[in-house]
Amino acid sequence: MAELLRSLRDSQLVARFQRRCGLFPAREASGEEHVVKNYFYYYLFRFSAALGQEVFYITFLPFTHWNIDPNLSRRLVVIWVLVMYIGQVAKDILKWPRPSFPPVVRLEKRIIAEYGMPSTHAMAATAISFTLLISTMDRYQYPFILGLMMAVVFSTLVCLSRLYTGMHTVLDILGGVLITAVLIALTYPAWTLIDSLDSASPLFPVCVIVVPFLLCYNYPVSDYYSPTRADTTTIVAAGAGVTLGFWINHFFQLVSKPTPSLPVIQNIPPLTTDMLVLGLTKFMVGIMLILLVRQLVQKLSLQVLFSWFKVVTRNKEARRRLEIEVPYKFVTYTSVGICATTFVPMLHRFLGLL
């Protein structure tokens, strides 16, 4: 078993996969970082890698909430936040390095400073795809085999993209998938509780804010700075904001037509041009408001924190300090989550888009 685990952590295994897919290191004299000999795999896995990054989740999850099913989006967000927090913390506790360069070709630079085990891209992709499958199979009428195939293909492409980009070993990916499978199995009995969070007691908002903030503020200390803590705070804060937004809607009765709780069997309506235009309009309106709120709250929170701690405003290194980074990220993305679930639907209603 130990020999098998060592072989799965071997960087040469990742390098061989890259070579099979047409990705090679460039010669030093060429001035290039890598050579691509198969652009089909290059674009396939670069696109697949994007499916596990922030740009996908800040588009897919809001789109699901505004156009498909708010209850489904809440469940997806809660599970996503849970697996991502555990995965990010596990990275900084285990401190396993990423595949070595050389022989591996690295296509991503931003997260090189992070540790590798487990792959949070693999965890997020597996969590989103299979939570979506499990949550919809008793709510919408569609061929289960088709849904299962789509979930497997989605998560597999994201996992393979982490090998292609040189960011993870095979063991990192298998570990991420296994951890996610265990978390889904353990939390599944409590999924109905997630659906009733909006009817919790008036003290619920305090817990939703205080507990996630403390989890982020007491994040494991790394040997050197990496974006892991900031990314984790962003994810956890967004989840707290979404959960709080649902509670606000219920407590203040801001939802004019309550959505039925899961599960309710429904037919998937056919996609028409009018539905597509309406959905894209709601999405664009919502995203613009979210970006506006994000920009305003981030700027205001940074100004307050810089003033409080007497820090030079344009000092980029100051943003990385624990007492500044966590509060400003948390306030910003909690506001984004509340905006997405409360103010955007109100704007949609005002504009006649509901």
Swiss-Prot record:
Site (Stabilizes the active site histidine for nucleophilic attack): D172
Protein name in UniProt: Sphingosine-1-phosphate phosphatase 2
Role played: Has specific phosphohydrolase activity towards sphingoid base 1-phosphates. Has high phosphohydrolase activity against dihydrosphingosine-1-phosphate and sphingosine-1-phosphate (S1P) in vitro. Sphingosine-1-phosphate phosphatase activity is needed for efficient recycling of sphingosine into the sphingolipid synthesis pathway. May play a role in attenuating intracellular sphingosine 1-phosphate (S1P) signaling. May play a role in pro-inflammatory signaling. Plays a role in the regulation of pancreatic islet beta-cell endoplasmic reticulum stress and proliferation.
Region (Phosphatase sequence motif III): 161-172
Region (Phosphatase sequence motif II): 118-121
Location of the protein in the cell: Endoplasmic reticulum membrane
Active site, UniProt feature: H121 (proton donor), H168 (nucleophile)
Main location: endoplasmic reticulum
Organism: Mus musculus
Membrane topology: Multi-pass membrane protein
Keywords: Endoplasmic reticulum, Hydrolase, Lipid metabolism, Membrane, Transmembrane, Transmembrane helix
Transmembrane segments: 43-63, 76-96, 115-135, 140-160, 173-193, 202-222, 235-255, 273-293, 334-354
Mutant phenotype after disruption: Mutans are viable into the adulthod. They exhibit smaller pancreatic islets, defective beta-cell proliferation and decreased blood insulin levels after treatment with a high-fat diet. Beta-cells show increased expression of proteins characteristic of the endoplasmic reticulum stress response.
InterPro entries in UniProt: P_Acid_Pase_2/haloperoxi_sf, P_Acid_Pase_2/haloperoxidase
The keyword 4Fe-4S is assigned to this record: no
UniProt catalytic activity: sphinganine 1-phosphate + H2O = sphinganine + phosphate; sphing-4-enine 1-phosphate + H2O = sphing-4-enine + phosphate; (4R)-hydroxysphinganine 1-phosphate + H2O = (4R)-hydroxysphinganine + phosphate
Region (Phosphatase sequence motif I): 91-99
Organism lineage string: Eukaryota, Metazoa, Chordata, Craniata, Vertebrata
Gene Ontology CC annotations of this record: endoplasmic reticulum membrane
Enzyme class: hydrolase
UniProt-listed Pfam families: PAP2
Alphabetized GO MF terms: dihydrosphingosine-1-phosphate phosphatase activity; sphingosine-1-phosphate phosphatase activity
Family from the record: Belongs to the type 2 lipid phosphate phosphatase family.
GO biological process, one term: regulation of type B pancreatic cell proliferation
UniProt EC number: 3.1.3.-
